């Protein structure tokens, strides 16, 4: 049986690593050892930040809603409470988008939430 030396396999792995390191600065773009470390770390960052992105966007929607709702004389927490009591099931992403693109429709939703709150 012939001996298998794995040269083709390691070359393919190295090529794949260097492709992933394309655009990196300095040695990390063309030295296998440095590129592998940089690519591994970049994958860790990517995994972490895919999860963080969801939190960041939710916080952004809440900030936008708070600003838009305060113009109508409510706070964010009272607005969300009013929506729950009125039975309006629209998520924060859609509400934030409405506040920016269709202020009159958003105002109608705010009025509905206000009417559901006790005076």
Swiss-Prot record:
Gene3D superfamilies: 6.10.160.10, Ribosomal protein L20. Keywords: Ribonucleoprotein, Ribosomal protein, RNA-binding, rRNA-binding. One of its GO terms (cellular component) is ribonucleoprotein complex. GO terms for biological process: ribosomal large subunit assembly; translation. GO terms for molecular function: rRNA binding; structural constituent of ribosome. Belongs to the bacterial ribosomal protein bL20 family. HAMAP family: Ribosomal_bL20 (MF_00382). Binds directly to 23S ribosomal RNA and is necessary for the in vitro assembly process of the 50S ribosomal subunit. It is not involved in the protein synthesizing functions of that subunit. This is Large ribosomal subunit protein bL20. It comes from Methylocella silvestris (strain DSM 15510 / CIP 108128 / LMG 27833 / NCIMB 13906 / BL2). The gene is rplT.
């Amino acid at each position: 049986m012939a001996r298998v030396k794995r040269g083709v396999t390691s070359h393919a792995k190295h090529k794949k690593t260097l492709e992933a390191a394309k655009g990196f600065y300095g040695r990390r773009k063309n030295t296998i050892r440095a590129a592998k470390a940089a690519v591994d770390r970049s994958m860790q960052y990517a995994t972490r930040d895919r999860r963080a992105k969801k939190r960041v966007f939710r916080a952004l929607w809440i900030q936008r809603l708070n600003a838009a709702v305060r113009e109508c004389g409510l706070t964010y927490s009272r607005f969300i409470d009013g929506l729950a009591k009125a039975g309006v099931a629209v998520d924060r992403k859609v509400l934030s988008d409405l506040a920016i693109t269709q202020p009159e429709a958003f105002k109608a939703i705010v009025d509905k939430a206000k009417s559901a709150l006790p005076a």
